[in-house]
Each structure stands twice: as C-alpha cells, then as structure tokens.
Amino acid sequence: MSWLDWIDHGIESQFNPRVAVGDAAESWLNGWVQESLRRKAELGGVFDIAYGTHELMQFDYASGDLALPVIIYINGGYWRALDKSAMMHHMADLAGSGFGVVNVNYPLCPEVTLTEIIACLNDAIAAIVVHVDAKT
C-alpha cells in the first residue's frame, strides 16, 4: 500500500509520536525533562551559545577530555517539538564518559521549513567547529 493511500491520521501517526502512542508520550518526555534538569549540574559546560539570530539557534558545550572526539547531539523532536533542554541527560552520560559533547537547538516547524532547519544546522556545525577549536 502506498503512503498516499493512508488516511490523514495514518500519515500523522507516522510523523508524530504523540499521535502514535498517545498520552504515554507526555509522561515519558516529562521524565526526560526532569532527569535533564537534575543532571545539568554535572556537566560544568557552557550553555546557550548563540550561532544565529533566532532564539532557538543555540548550543551547549561540555568539553570532557579534550583528547577524545566531540559528539554533536541534535534534538530529534521530529523537527517540531522539544529542545536541547530535554536532552541534557544524554549529554551528561556522554560527557561523563570523557567525550566532548555539543547539544544543538534549532528553530522548529511549522515556523520554519525543513530546508531552513538544514541551513540552521549547517550554521551550527560551523560555529561549533570554531568554538571547539578555540578550546583546544
């Protein structure tokens, strides 16, 4: 069956986890936010580094062991939900293992298009390279 044959709900459930799993998603995501707030203090990083003019064009950086690679974590909120603040617990786990970690925010749909998100992430990567190079 082609995706073009799906009814609107079927298409929406493929692209929106909140539709696919219902109320369980909110509880799960709220848990992420609470755990992220609790673990942010462990990071000792630099937060909300701007890489553009939009309020969501920011990243966080925890340097870890500068001899190890830097991992860039991009929020996977289906381009339209959440932000980096809900992902701090992932960042803390990686930084706790010695990696440098960058946690990136970007503007969300429908305010911007996917093409604009890609442009923002290109800008973010360029700014991250400059920032990390300055720290090493």
Where are these regions (language model features)?
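N-terminal cap/lid segment of alpha/beta-hydrolase-fold proteins
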Residues: F15-L66
